[in-house]
Amino acid sequence: MSLQNAEANLKEFGKELNLEGLAFDENHTCILGIDNTFSLHLTYEPNSDRLYLYSPILDGLPKDDPSKLKLYEALLEGSMLGGQMAGGGVGVAVKEELILMHCVLEMGSGADPSSLRRFAPLFVESVEKWRERAKNIIEGRDPGATGIPGGGPIGGGGQPRPPGKDDDNPKPGDRFIKI
């Protein structure tokens, strides 16, 4: 039943892309080229009833340790609880010099046949932002590992506030609604 859900999701996604006949191969994988810049891999895993989406963020790791550290910090910060990664995460294959961003869609009984169609644009947009961010870090054009695609200091300034000017700073709990 779950493979049928994954196939229905892929078919619905194919209709959205005007790619009728989109199907999984014998390994339950479908690979799509995105704007001739990167690939979107869709793999159904029958043992877990999950559809995995994954794409390369970077192919080739920085050679110098400071750039590598800055890149890893940005990726780790951005992937905390999936916050900047469409709810997913990131992994590094050091020997292969590859960084992949990934997400999972449940395909068990009752899975919505349009969940992939609705989710894929968000995932692709996030991959594009992280690819740009990684490129900027490697090229030395990223001012800080903030976890925000595009970099830059949080708040946009980066200048320390003069003493006594902390009134605009939120206090712990200010951004939360008490229920």
Regions found by a protein language model. Give the residues of each.
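Charge-rich, low-complexity N-terminal segments
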Residues: 1-41
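Helix-rich interaction surfaces within compact, conserved domain-sized segments
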Residues: 120, 124-128
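Short, well-structured hydrophobic secondary-structure segments
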Residues: 39-63
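Short, internal acidic amphipathic alpha-helical interface segments
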Residues: 57-97
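Hydrophobic residues embedded in beta-strands of well-ordered beta-sheets
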Residues: 30, 49-51, 97-99
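Structural motif
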Residues: 26, 45-47, 95
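Short, highly charged C-terminal tails/helix-capping segments
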Residues: 134-179
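Well-ordered alpha/beta subsegment
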Residues: 87-121, 135-142
